[in-house]
UniProtKB/Swiss-Prot annotation:
EC annotation from Swiss-Prot or TrEMBL: 4.1.1.23
Listed pathway(s): Pyrimidine metabolism; UMP biosynthesis via de novo pathway; UMP from orotate: step 2/2
Source species taxonomy: Eukaryota, Fungi, Dikarya, Ascomycota, Pezizomycotina
Organism of origin: Aspergillus niger
Domain of life: Eukaryota
Positions contributing to substrate binding: 40, 62-64, 93-102, 229, 247
Protein name per UniProt: Orotidine 5'-phosphate decarboxylase
Amino acid sequence: MSSKSQLTYTARASKHPNALAKRLFEIAEAKKTNVTVSADVTTTKELLDLADRLGPYIAVIKTHIDILSDFSDETIEGLKALAQKHNFLIFEDRKFIDIGNTVQKQYHRGTLRISEWAHIINCSILPGEGIVEALAQTASAPDFSYGPERGLLILAEMTSKGSLATGQYTTSSVDYARKYKNFVMGFVSTRSLGEVQSEVSSPSDEEDFVVFTTGVNISSKGDKLGQQYQTPASAIGRGADFIIAGRGIYAAPDPVQAAQQYQKEGWEAYLARVGGN
């Protein structure tokens, strides 16, 4: 898979074939941040408070909306308003993993109403190609009013110890991304997938998938449940375009100060990668 990670966000935005990825790169450049904060809190008040306080320093807020104890219209409208106020995208880390008919309903129907407010979603390809096809089909349907403002990340790798998301699974992730590139904007992975060789698909000249890397933490190397952390510099150096940090920010004594530190380190690592100062 070809990689354009040595190019600036501005250069990538100017030629990117995916409208949401283009917007994401423009946000990153405008705010000088590649930080995604994983806001793993359990009440709407906590979520909206974090989104408002950290909004100026992040490109994306990542939610696990089903862990909220009080999800309601207030959650949805509040999050959408803050995304507009602070110019960030919303990534619902739902990790869809079921047959196509089911995930279509989970995404565009149901109590969580994910398609209404989440710019970005993700899925595992363990069920096969059908899950990506189904989500892409939903997003391109005539009655889907959000169109190019929605995109999918394929969970190609994970940072947990002993992860089975390796080898052929990762290669197939690349294959499906290429086939459904109008909706698939990139991957959640531990590195650039530029060296992945496929016998099924080949890169096009304009191919430019966005890489999000989870498990970024400045002060910790892991936890007791098998999570393995990278620093902002190591993640960006391995090909991440956007770094995802959770407890290192929201559980810090001063989350705003922590977000600013991740923003600084992530941006410096990006400038070093593209040859800036």
